[in-house]
Amino acid sequence: MVKPRASRTREQVTANSDAGGYWTGTHTLHRLRFHLVWTPKYRRRVLEGAVAARLTALLHEACEIKDWQIHELSVQPDHVHLLLQVSPTDSIFSVMQVLKGGTSGRLRTEFPHLEEFLWGKHFWGEGYFAETVGQKEEAVLRAYIRNQGKKSEGSGVPDSAKPKKVRP
């Protein structure tokens, strides 16, 4: 099991979260929030019911241990959306290693019936999506994550997240 870092205390995180979400370190003031999305291998629709509930608990547990703050989380049958605040010492690669690697083995062990859908040694697909989130777009992104899986008019994708058309 990974030990919590001693670089900042829970009180510092909580106190600074109320002041615009900024965290402090020894010589730093930072607000690093990322929108992360990843999928099960083959984009199988296996994140439902007890599996989704357990994944949610495992993600909260991992983030508590690493001293990261979950701002929004949506587990859909075939993908996960997460709005996460981390420290400047955490690379996105290492964050995803903890989130995907730390949940993969436990989910496969606790739900052996998933072998039928996810053969091999991997639960998650290889890739992931990561983007930084500024204060201005955070409200739109939070609503987007909260409304995942709900029927709506239109695509449900914020205009800022839609691909831009480039004319030749």
Language model features by range: what are they?
Residues 1-168:
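Basic nucleic-acid-binding interfaces
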